[in-house]
Amino acid sequence: MTKRKKRAAINLTRLPIEYIDWLSRPIYRFIHIESAAGIVLFISTLLAVLLANSHLSEEFARFWQISLGMTVGDLVFERSLHKWVNDAGMTLFFFLIALELKRELVLGELRNPQLALLSIAAALGGMSTPPLFYLLLQYGESGQHGWGTVMATDTAFVIGCLALLGRSIPSSLRIFMLSMAVVDDIGAIFVVAIGYGEAVDWLVLSYALLGFMLVRAMAFLGVRSLVLFSIVGGAIWLVIDMSGVHPTITGVILGLLTPTNKWMSRQHLFIIMEALVPSSPSQQWSGDKREGEILKTAAAAARETLSPVERLEMLLHPWVGFVVLPLFALANAGVSLTSVNLTSPITLAVFVGFVFGKPIGIVLFSWIAVWLGIAKLPENLNWGMVFGGGMLAGIGFTMALFISELAYNPDQINAAKLGIFIASITSALIGFLCLRYFAAREKQKRT
């Protein structure tokens, strides 16, 4: 076969390329860079701080207070743009986090019980120890109720830092960090739903439980339509919101209920494709109705070789990483530097909780789990890298800002945000340097 024929055969396996594809391809490539979402999130944060301290600060604050909603009969669903981003947008974020955890537990590395228990133990340490450090400084004080702020880890920024380290760190560390951060975030959102919600209407909440049972029944019966699941999920979100429980918990529960089974195996797909596609390139589709139905069957078969969890992850990753989280940063990260007080007890408590509580809790609980024999360190991972990972987990940013909006009074939020910023920057720098150092030492030992 000549080179020209080979090239033609290869091109036949690709989709046609239009001018718009040449323009959009660089954007598409950027979106799929692992650290890209972290970069966009950082730029959004910087922009929010700049706008909050510019002559446009009042207009910027008023923009997020624009009221949006709808009325259905006697029911009124209305809230500020800021609240829509925090409540509805972050529900999508937590839904994606729960999908990632479900996939890892059923299809990924966390199928190994000892590796899963190490991540769970580390997450428990990362959730429980920082609030203790925080309360050591704030118990009985005005900021006591903000203990939940220091519980969670910003998964997007952690992914960005790990991507910057590249191949200098082992893949086992990446898996450990991401699974720990996901478990950490899910634990934190349960605390938010219970600890920072309003008075609970248990009757209304029972309707939400019926909704979750309906979702489970739909999955059991083999319903595959993501549109139907989205409609039911949206209804559950509204019911939970009316019950007094924070509605973002909807995302976590729905994510964990999402099926991981594939309707169509790849072998089955190949058999269908061989039967449907003309055997010779010279054969032409006539374009009649029957052949149109055949093509629809082939498209459905190709789509269903991915589980609902995988399909939803692929669909939501760009939207969450490049729309939801940047909007959240713009809505919440604006700190007025004119009113900053570096000596605020709340700022100090948040800083200590993240920078000291996170690494100590993660290392301590991980060590206890390994010592008890219920977990083991993955290959190529040492305790120095676990400590460095614990420092990176002190980047609380997105999650911490989210919880701080619920936990503090308006006159305390600026102090909490400042503590979050300083702690996140400190944790990122120390964690990055520690991981580079300990990863290099581990490589030297093995050579």
From Swiss-Prot:
One Pfam match: Na_H_antiport_1
Matches recorded under InterPro entries: Na/H_antiporter_dom_sf (IPR023171), NhaA (IPR004670)
Gene Ontology MF term list: sodium:proton antiporter activity
Membrane topology, record value: Multi-pass membrane protein
Segments passing through the bilayer: 30-50, 81-101, 117-137, 146-166, 175-195, 199-219, 220-240, 315-335, 350-370, 383-403, 415-435
Keyword Membrane: yes
HAMAP family from the UniProt entry: NhaA
Family the entry assigns: Belongs to the NhaA Na(+)/H(+) (TC 2.A.33) antiporter family.
Record's function text: Na(+)/H(+) antiporter that extrudes sodium in exchange for external protons.
Protein name as catalogued: Na(+)/H(+) antiporter NhaA 2
Source species: Vibrio vulnificus (strain CMCP6)
Gene of this entry: nhaA2
